[in-house]
Amino acid sequence: MSGPAIDASPALTFNQSSASIQQRRLSTGRQMWVLYRRFAAPSLLNGEVLTTVGAPIIFMVGFYIPFAIPWNQFVGGASSGVASNLGQYITPLVTLQAVSFAAIGSGFRAATDSLLGVNRRFQSMPMAPLTPLLARVWVAVDRCFTGLVISLVCGYVIGFRFHRGALYIVGFCLLVIAIGAVLSFAADLVGTVTRNPDAMLPLLSLPILIFGLLSIGLMPLKLFPHWIHPFVRNQPISQFVAALRALAGDTTKTASQVSWPVMAPTLTWLFAFVVILALSSTIVLARRP
């Protein structure tokens, strides 16, 4: 008597399930690539690329020329030990301002898609809710990379230099891009909620400028009024600038070193922003557009 036949259906089911998962991954990748091309193509014609290139130049000129004389008179120039030159001091802030303005494009695209009902059509498709958002952020991160490169070139012209090894240079660039990605994600959520493309520039640029001016990116903490020292010292832009200066290094004896006390506040701010944005995205994307 022959033994009972073995049912092969579980193995088939497992294989089919694995193939289905792999197919979904490939489908999501293709969807992101198609959406990336859709979002990136108009930016080549609407002036966004020109703005991405021009913003770092304008910021560098706008910060360097007015602060060149006060830098020598009130800070003390290179002899003060604050920084070897003004270019070394302000370039980290300019890189942050550049990627911040590049991130605004993600909010503009999200607001436009929400206003025109494109997000509603996306929701009716077999597509993960995060896919359009991540595609828009992908485009913004590309623009952030462009802004970073232009900022470093401008900084090099006025005296900025990296004084540490290649690993620190990579860390500097990755930190700037990570900050740009977080800001792009936040701008996208704001644009999705407001559905007002015209409001994106003032709504997102004013906080960036205010926090940048009230930071140690332009002048040392001692030159601010005492009553605002706690805010200036602890706000995220100041902490980001301090971390970037440590990664860039300097020739002065008082140059910040890359250490846990210097980097921890920056990593804490980034982690807090990621948590807040993750929670916010679940609420925003769960809404019917």
From Swiss-Prot:
Description of how the protein assembles with itself and partners: The complex is composed of two ATP-binding proteins (DrrA) and two transmembrane proteins (DrrB and DrrC).
One GO-annotated biological process of the protein: daunorubicin transport
Miscellaneous comment as given in the Swiss-Prot or TrEMBL entry: Was identified as a high-confidence drug target.
Keyword Transmembrane listed: yes
Record protein name field: Doxorubicin resistance ABC transporter permease protein DrrB
Nucleotide-binding listed as a keyword: no
Family annotation (Pfam families): ABC2_membrane_3 (PF12698)
Record keywords, A-Z: Antibiotic resistance, Cell membrane, Membrane, Transmembrane, Transmembrane helix, Transport
Origin: domain of life: Bacteria
Membrane topology classification: Multi-pass membrane protein
Subcellular location: Cell membrane
InterPro entries reported for this sequence: ABC2_TM, ABC_2_transport, ABC_transpt_DrrB/DrrC, T7SS_ABC-Transporter
Membrane-crossing residue ranges in chain numbering: 49-69, 88-108, 138-158, 166-186, 199-219, 266-286
Purpose: Part of the ABC transporter complex DrrABC involved in doxorubicin resistance. Probably responsible for the translocation of the substrate across the membrane.
Molecular function (Gene Ontology), one example: ABC-type transporter activity
Family: Belongs to the ABC-2 integral membrane protein family.
CC terms in the record's Gene Ontology section: ATP-binding cassette (ABC) transporter complex; plasma membrane
Domain ABC transmembrane type-2: 47-282
